[in-house]
Amino acid sequence: MEADGQKYSVLAKTQVREKMMKEIEQISEVFLVSKSDATVILIRLGWNSFKASDLLGDNKEKFLAKLGLARVLNSNSSSADRETGDGDYLVSTPFCSHKFSTTCWSEYLSDALKKNKEQRGLISCLSQDCVASVGPDTIEQLTEPVKEMYENYILESFMECHKATIKWCPASGCEYAVELQEDGNEDNVISVVCLCGHTFCWTCGLESHRPVSCKKASIWWTYLLDQSRSISWIHTNTKSCPKCKIPVQQNGDPNYRLINCICSNNFCWICLRTEEQHQGNWNCSPVAVPAAGPSTVEFSQILHLNLWEAGHEALKKAKSKLRALEEKIIPKLIENCGATELDIRTVREAGMLSVQCRQVLKWSCVFDYSIIEYESTKKQYLKHLRALASTMLCMHEGKLDELIHLALSPEDFTNYKHKLEISTTCTGNHFDGFIKELEDGKPEVKADGYENEPGSRWFCDRCTFENSWVDKQCKMCFFPLDYHPSPQVAAAPEDLGKSE
């Protein structure tokens, strides 16, 4: 994990704005242009400060004129302060004399900002043929809703152009951003934890899914998860008709026991006998033998769905604990124990590590699902690794609880903090090894069955998942094997090209 060598930092929205303003101020100060003009320049150039410096250094006046940041008409006497009625005023850009009411500007800019949301192009004067650019200095004269919309437009432009190194947390309602550190490598940062408790994959934006690949995580998230829930619901809430074996759901009245199947067979929901077999006596007991159980594939889906949901509940508790740590515990530690910023970082990283580890354990059941059933040795070994990782995590969470509940003085805090630092490092290293072992495919574990037999695998045409030839459909996306040639009839390389 990244707890003891974190390659990213979590920023509040105000901190992101500060970074943005720093770039604007640098261009403004070095090339003696207003902050408003510097903002327009950076938006137009995709926030490429180096390119902006080159163009401003080569021919500043020509470049500014090209962007509509130079006067295009001799302005008449200012009437920006002249009232037009109902509190409305006439406003123009600093580069032209075309004046329009604030109402017209507001309507125009609302539409223009929405259209420019993707293109990040220039916004020109409201006059049809005028090339004067609209910047923050013009926006400042307008209403508060327009100002807020324009500020968000600038910020989103900044984020979009820096998305390789900084991204918003995708959690609903969260306003934190995650930024890679200067020595961080985007390819090496896979899982990040926001201060809101949400963990997500830097590459694909889904919730963090290590040790599962982005592709398999997407398939599980968008298709298999819903299918598994449907299968689980069917086997919990239906019974198979004794005649046609089709799953049948009880009607809305739990007291009405006679079920009508689409095959025209009527049977009792309790004992599965027909109405005639009851002979008017409905005082029956449930049958000892249930209806047809799930298939091997369905059973596997139900099993892993239960593991997934148990892991999800444990993750929710870890996230809730992290929020409480941030909102309640840390302020108390500062007040009662005199905790410094470095101390708080230690406690915060311990809580974030707990969330990361719970996320890994949750997704490890999906990794287990992707292992074909004949690789039983790998499944057993994975079960062993998961048990070790769970034990290690419980011990780490115990150390964090000790600090939270028992550190009542600066001396206590120092003692428990030292233990927590050791636990964070050891637990992070253990889960790093756990993840790496799974992502590398556990090469030291020899799979049972057909592992070394020629032609014992086929790759799904839809999702490229590797299946065994005994599987008649893909275990990941259920694409049928119909179009794949059997290994028994496939021609050997030395036979290719031979005539009859």
Curated annotation (Swiss-Prot):
It catalyses: [E2 ubiquitin-conjugating enzyme]-S-ubiquitinyl-L-cysteine + [acceptor protein]-L-lysine = [E2 ubiquitin-conjugating enzyme]-L-cysteine + [acceptor protein]-N(6)-ubiquitinyl-L-lysine. Zn(2+) 2 binds at C169, C174, C194, C196. Pathway: Protein modification; protein ubiquitination. A zinc finger (RING-type) spans 78-130, 241-271. InterPro entries: E3_UB_ligase_RBR, IBR_dom, TRIAD_supradom, Znf_RanBP2, Znf_RING/FYVE/PHD. Binds 4 Zn(2+) ions per subunit. Zn(2+) 4 binds at C241, C244, C261, C263. A zinc finger (IBR-type) spans 148-214. This is Probable E3 ubiquitin-protein ligase ARI16. It comes from Arabidopsis thaliana (Mouse-ear cress).
